[in-house]
Amino acid sequence: MNKKRDFIDTKDFSKEEILFMIEIGRKMKESIKNGHYPQLLKHKTLGMIFEQSSTRTRVSFETAMTQLGGHAQYLAPGQIQLGGHESVGDTAKVLSRLVDILMARVERHQTVVELANTAAIPVINGMSDYNHPTQELGDAITMFEHLPKGKKIEDCKIVFVGDATQVCASTMFMATKLGMDFVQFGPKGFQLREEHLKVAEENCEVSGGSYLITEDVDIALKDADFIYTDVWYGLYEAELSEEERMKTFYPKYQVNKELISKAAPHVKFMHCLPATRGEEVTDEVLDAPYSVVIDEAENRLTAMRALLVYFMNPYVKEAGFAVAEKYDAELELLLRNGAGL
């Protein structure tokens, strides 16, 4: 019997497995844009646990399940006994008998880890205080769609501007997994921690990528292909007032036209959204032709479809790359013939 796998952290997957997920997502995106909805998840049910509110995560997962023939069950805060009257472990065991896969967006990373360790079904991390792996996958798809002409992903540099949020950490995890050069341009005290850098170092040893943490804007932005930012209050929301946040990050770490001009001419701007206009990014940048933030939001759906198929379709129950290649051929044929409509 094959060991159950979960999507808690991309460090648990090889570069080849991540690239395969990306390819599944891109092929299904193309198929659906052409009006073909492969029913790969027919009769499957996703249970969605939310300790935090969400727009993109909830809508993306629900839409993905519907498009592929399945059903999503929303479990809102206060509607289930997660960690309250009922333990996290007991909740996981019960839901394992009722649904086929779980997604959890939680306040503490340990909660989703405990769900995964106890559940008999796959568990997907929809975001925790440590990382945001589904965002990682959607962002990777977006970068592949917007690669500079003549460049491979391994040739690209991505710069994260600002606070060391879980999205910043996840951006580094994915970039170094893919062999990219990653830079965090942020102030001391708000830079990625040693536990994050250890993962990046391990990734780079395998992929040939690199990482750098700096307060020097010119070093950070030189030849950047992608610039990414997030809100300024991620992990430190309870520690800093709005006035203190602005004093720490503004204006040096605001993504504006001047900062963009220091990057490569073909640079693309990324943001996980929602954005606080006028703080971490100006309207001029967020709405610019080089901004790909709406593509990113759409590719959350692309990523969710890929993950759900990867973990629930029988061809990829075992995630070895040989199986991935076999399923790749099956999916190619299915999409070409428009089967399952």
From Swiss-Prot:
Catalytic EC class: transferase
Gene3D superfamilies: Aspartate/ornithine carbamoyltransferase
InterPro entries: Asp/Orn_carbamoyltranf_P-bd, Asp/Orn_carbamoylTrfase, Asp/Orn_carbamoylTrfase_sf, Asp_carbamoyltransf_Asp/Orn-bd, Orn/put_carbamltrans, PtcA
Keywords noted in UniProt: Cytoplasm, Polyamine biosynthesis, Transferase
One Pfam family recorded for the sequence: OTCace
Residues the record lists as binding carbamoyl phosphate: 54-58, 105, 132
Cell location: Cytoplasm
Catalyzed reactions: carbamoyl phosphate + putrescine = N-carbamoylputrescine + phosphate + H(+)
Binding annotation for putrescine: 271-274
UniProt GO MF annotations: amino acid binding; ornithine carbamoyltransferase activity; putrescine carbamoyltransferase activity
Domain of life from the UniProt record: Bacteria
Purpose of the protein: Catalyzes the phosphorolysis of N-carbamoylputrescine to form carbamoyl phosphate and putrescine. Is involved in the degradation pathway of the polyamine agmatine.
Similarity section: Belongs to the aspartate/ornithine carbamoyltransferase superfamily. PTCase family.
NCBIfam families per the UniProt record, alphabetical: orni_carb_tr, PRK00779.1, putr_carbamoyl
The protein, known as: Putrescine carbamoyltransferase
Organism: Listeria monocytogenes serovar 1/2a (strain ATCC BAA-679 / EGD-e)
Annotated gene: ptcA
